[in-house]
Amino acid sequence: RSAKEALKLITTMIGEYGQGGNCGFHKAFYYDNAFLIADENEAYVLETAGRSWAVKKAGEVETISNCLGLRADYEAASAGVSGDFRRAHQNHLVTAVAGAEKRRAASRAVLSGEGEPFELMMKA
């Protein structure tokens, strides 16, 4: 099996069935998902929102962390998606409360070798 096959399966299922369900403990809380899909030859970043999705080939360093990162730089998307995917779909309150942007930046810095892993992660 390949990353392309996994990508096709996930996007087909999201388009057909949607995703999610209540993941809150005491109240309703829903969020969308992102995936890093890889095999020995290639890798993809897939971000989703409801039944919508956008994907691009992964660069040398990629991270996901409870926030959308694809702007208009995706290579393929579900029907009806155009422009800035993040701007159209990101829940800014959830992203801020979760500290997602800081955590994503810290994990990217660690993977890029831009600092001491423990110090960077403690700042996130």
Features from the language model and the residues they span:
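Non-transmembrane, interaction-prone segments in cytosolic or luminal domains
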Residues: 6, 21-27, 112, 119-124
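Short alpha-helical interface elements
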Residues: 20-22, 31, 62
